[in-house]
A protein has these predicted regions:
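Short beta->alpha connector loops
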Residues: 13, 32-33, 48-49
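Structured loop/turn residues at beta-strand edges in well-structured enzyme cores
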Residues: 2, 37-38
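Aromatic/acidic, Gly/Pro-rich catalytic loop(s) in extracytoplasmic/lumenal soluble domains
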Residues: 40-224
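Short acidic low-complexity segments
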Residues: 28-37
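Short loop/helix-cap segments at secondary-structure boundaries that form the rim of catalytic
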Residues: 15-22, 36-37, 53-57
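Extracytoplasmic
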Residues: 1-12, 17-27
């Protein structure tokens, strides 16, 4: 998740996150003084948190898993908070998907974007993060863009969670193609939130990888 996100967690997990360098000001410690995870962006659902909130964790506070680690009692789910309740969140998620389908379709039809196969299908299906969609459109305004793959580094994410990373390939060998990738990277590095990525880097001279932090924002593209 982004360093700016507010993370709700049980006292033991919050202590671990703080020891790993996560700012204490961004941690919402669940317990007697904090009755619920509302006010945070994500909740770290350890066994203690699941036991505390039971079915309300999914049905009321945080319906979508954006990452999951481990199994059984040791499983840890990272869940996106629904600040206005599950029904409102699911409606916003459905509307956002419709907007992503529309924006993805525009990219597929853009003559300055080269994309085929699985990556093309992801765009058409609305499976791509809105920040990536807007970033790719901005890049295509400047030059031709070859998309080779979209990905999501988070294990165990719900199927409704958008893909938050993209790999852009050089258009050919040589210094000119590498310069084109570096030009894209410079534009991406100049972005401010919410369009500043978690990481963006060149893979040698042949590709550029961009990844955005979870959770993906809703409503960024406007209504369908």
């Amino acid at each position: 998740v982004a360093a700016s996100a507010i993370v709700a967690c049980d006292p033991a997990m919050c202590a671990v996150l703080h020891a790993d360098g996560f700012p204490s000001t961004r941690l919402l410690v669940l317990g007697t003084a904090t009755a619920d995870p509302l006010g945070s962006d994500v909740v770290v659902a350890t066994l203690a948190v699941r036991n505390e909130f039971g079915t309300r964790l999914q049905s009321v506070y945080a319906p979508v898993v954006i990452a999951s680690f481990g199994t059984g009692a040791g499983r840890i789910d990272i869940r996106a908070i629904a600040p206005d309740g599950t029904a409102a969140y699911e409606a916003a998620l459905a509307a956002d998907r419709r907007s992503r389908i529309s924006a993805g379709g525009q990219l597929v039809r853009n003559p300055r974007i080269i994309v085929t196969g699985v990556a093309r299908n992801a765009l058409s299906a609305g499976d791509v993060d809105p920040r990536l969609l807007m970033m790719l459109a901005a890049l295509a305004d400047q030059q031709q863009v070859r998309i080779t793959a979209f990905g999501d580094p988070s294990p165990g994410a719900s199927s409704v969670v958008p893909l938050r990373s993209v790999q852009i390939a050089a258009l050919g060998p040589g210094a000119e193609a590498e310069a084109s990738l570096r030009s894209m990277l410079s534009l991406i590095d100049a972005q401010r939130q919410p369009f500043q990525p978690l990481r963006a880097a060149l893979a040698g001279s042949s590709a550029l990888t961009v990844e955005y932090a979870a959770p993906s924002p809703l409503g960024l593209l406007g209504g369908p």
